[in-house]
A protein has these predicted regions:
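Short acidic, glycine/Ser/Thr-rich loop/turn "cap" segments at secondary-structure junctions
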Residues: 1-7, 45-47, 73-81, 104-108
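Short acidic, glycine/serine/threonine-rich loops at helix termini
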Residues: 47-53, 73-77, 111, 118-124, ...
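Short, structured patches in soluble enzyme cores that scaffold and shape functional sites
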Residues: 41, 76-79, 113, 135, ...
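Active-site-proximal, Lys/Arg-enriched surface segment
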Residues: 1-65
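Short, conserved catalytic/metal-binding motifs centered on acidic residues
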Residues: 1, 35-43, 70, 106-116, ...
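Electropositive, glycine- and tryptophan-enriched low-complexity nucleic-acid-binding patches
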Residues: 55-102
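An anionic, glycine-rich sequence signature occurring as long contiguous blocks
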Residues: 130-166
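Domain-level cores of phosphate- or acyl-group-handling catalytic modules
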Residues: 84-142
Length: 166
């Protein structure tokens, strides 16, 4: 890392290729179809010898996991003490390119605030038709959004949302 810290990182390319190929072979993914894509880091508590303390104060791992619908399409493991932003752009690029090589197209990509950076937005925009990346909480952004006029209530998939165009 830029700070001089050392992290263990496993991109598991062969296993991720096998995973996507198995999903195609079993018909769980179909080439030339569009899918919704989700990415997040999961914290897995474990007492294995190589596990490290996470910022959540337990020993474990924090792999980045990508799903399409209800199937996992990519996993890259990292130390529990690795910042979620560390090489996340590289992780997502590998996963998106693996799916594109299999002719799997991403309609909508969703990620949490760990993916909120200009570089991530630019990269995700290249690999999906639409995307949602939750912004980091920030007082000035909250104030700007609160000041917007024209909010309206919409129901999407049975859930009520307040929406407004910027």
């Amino acid at each position: 890392s830029d700070s001089g810290k050392s992290y263990d990182f496993n991109v598991a390319s062969d296993l991720n290729n096998l995973l996507v190929n198995a999903l195609l072979a079993t018909g769980q993914l179909l080439p030339d179809n569009e899918y919704d894509f989700d990415f997040d880091h999961q914290f897995i508590e474990t007492e294995k010898f190589d596990a490290k303390i996470t910022y959540k104060k337990f020993t474990g791992y924090s792999p980045g996991i990508a799903t399409v619908g209800d199937v996992i399409v990519g996993i890259e493991n990292r130390d529990g003490n690795t910042n979620v932003r560390f090489h996340q752009e590289d992780t997502l690029k590998r996963i998106f390119e693996r799916l594109e090589n299999a002719r799997i197209h991403i309609n909508r990509a969703r990620m949490d605030c760990g993916s909120c950076s200009e570089a991530m937005v630019e990269m995700v925009e290249k690999h999906s038709r639409h995307f949602y990346i939750r912004a980091n909480r920030c007082v000035s952004l909250y104030d700007d959004i609160f000041a917007l006029r024209g909010w309206k209530t919409e129901y999407i998939n049975g859930h009520e949302f307040e929406i407004c165009s910027i």
